[in-house]
Amino acid sequence: MSILQILDNDVLRNIIDYLDLKDETAFVSTCQYLYYYRKTFRRIYRLEKIIVFKLKNPDHIIPENTTHLVVTFNQSIGKINIPKNVSRLTFCPQFNKSIDDIPSTITHLSLGAAFNGEVSNIPTSVTHLKLGVSFKRKLSEIPLSVTHLTLNSYDTEIHGPIPSTITHLAFAEDFNQSINGLVPNFVGHLRIRQYNSNLEIPNHIYHLSLNSYEYNKQNELPNYIKFLDIRYIFPVKYKFIPETVTHLSFGNWFNANITTIIPNITHLVIKSCYECLIKNKIPDNITHLILY
């Protein structure tokens, strides 16, 4: 086994960075694998756009065309040179360090399950924020630039109040607390795991997103919702959709007769269920149809 097979890829790349073109050519010619590694890395670096780049070490070079950066280590990011094109920043579940050095280009920030640090120092460029299970600080510390807030895995009491700039509020799939009295009147879009009659959905909510919904007479959806997204429905009943709904989106597990959709629906989104379209006629009231 040669030394080139023993050394880590990052070590080899760092060695090459110190060589001029002549020495680099001689070095990589000693190992076909290293040649292809270097060639592949250069191709990646020259891509016009990289959607997601996972950063496994603070010393790694981040391609300038990266737009979504995922930090997979629990270390300060102060020494990381984050490219100006990065707008989405996601931290691993173990991350719980200072976020003082987040650049002002970030608009979407996702903090991991272990994070319980200061959030008042988040740059005002951030509009979308996700918090994890360990976050126990007051939500009022969140910068007023944030309009979309996701509370992930909360298993304890929420430390309010929710900032007045929040218009989109999401409670994660494993959120297990009552939301009664928690949704301010400035929130218009609400995402929750499951709806039941014990939940108090404020009448200022016009867009409701549900992971699952089981219809019965005692569990009817409120009649002031205009936009409705449902991922799972068990079972599907006739006229289970409020008459106020005009925009309707079904998830992957919807497989029902769409002719029962109320006449007020004009915009319909169906994900990976084409049998319901083949077997049934699309209602005449549908003016916009999106299939995934």
From Swiss-Prot:
Pfam families: FNIP
InterPro entries: FNIP, STK_FNIP-Repeat
FNIP repeats: from-to residues: 95-134
Protein name per UniProt: Putative FNIP repeat-containing protein L281
Organism whose genome encodes this protein: Acanthamoeba polyphaga mimivirus
